Amino acid sequence: MFNYQSFAEVFAFDPECSYDEETVSMIERNRKDMEGLFIDRVVKETGIVRPAKHYPPKSNNGFRTLHKAIIESSGADHTKISILYYLLLTFDFPTGKRDYSLALEQSTFLPQKYQIFMKGLWHMDRKEFEAAVQYLTHPSLIPTFADEILEVLVRKSKDDLTLALAYYHTAQPTLTSRSAIECFFSAIARTSVTDAFYFTRSQPQHSQQHMFEMLVSVVLNNSPKDLVADRSLELVSLPLSLEENAWFEEYLLYGDGRALKKSKDTVLMRKIGTGNFIDALSMRGINSRSIGNLDWNNLSDGIKHGLGPRIDG
């Protein structure tokens, strides 16, 4: 019977095996660039506190030491085998085949969901994100390391959120870290004001106001110049509840948002857009310039003319 605790059996294809220098350098470079590898997180689950001390192994002796540390750890058998499977994927890569990892799959009866998950993490660690997402969104998987996966996909996206959104909408993970939530949310807000707005509503009640204010800030402060008018119009046209509208005005008129460019103008835009003309006219002293092709002084004159005697009613 196959014994995964035997180094000679796991690495029967070459008991003197080791990674070449280029592979070791790539692994170390990616660990630094991504602030940690996903295999590090799996290894830590076995009780090994410092994965970087063992991985990547720089020699055959290093491989034997790593194997011994995994086997003697307190991790579950399927976790230990999954780590060994991950190691074999790297040996498979130069051959263009799956001989080594397949042999371990068959010898240990490693469940398919663990194979799929480890392949996903392996591609993440190689920064092959498109391939990684294909594995990590497999319906057999329960989202694991979702916060970290999403943060990496966003930060390494180069402003293309296709993969991050595909992972989020397909895997439907429950994000738990504030860092991941805000990272993902700010990325959505840069892409679609409306999508970001509905994302705020999907969050716990206690965090909705903070995220709504983030959305307003991103739109007014971080939109490209050629898009700020359109994005501002999209913002003021959102179907806000009474509470959200109160947050909107409080943030832009009295809160931290009052320091943003066009903060008062944006409130005025919403009042006009929602037909609240009397309140719009009550906003004296804005003294603003135009946003896009809109000049608020001219608009005020137009509103007064349109309302006529109703202003005094």
Whereabouts are the PLM-identified features?
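Extended alpha-helical solenoid/arm regions of large eukaryotic scaffolding proteins
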Residues: M1-G313
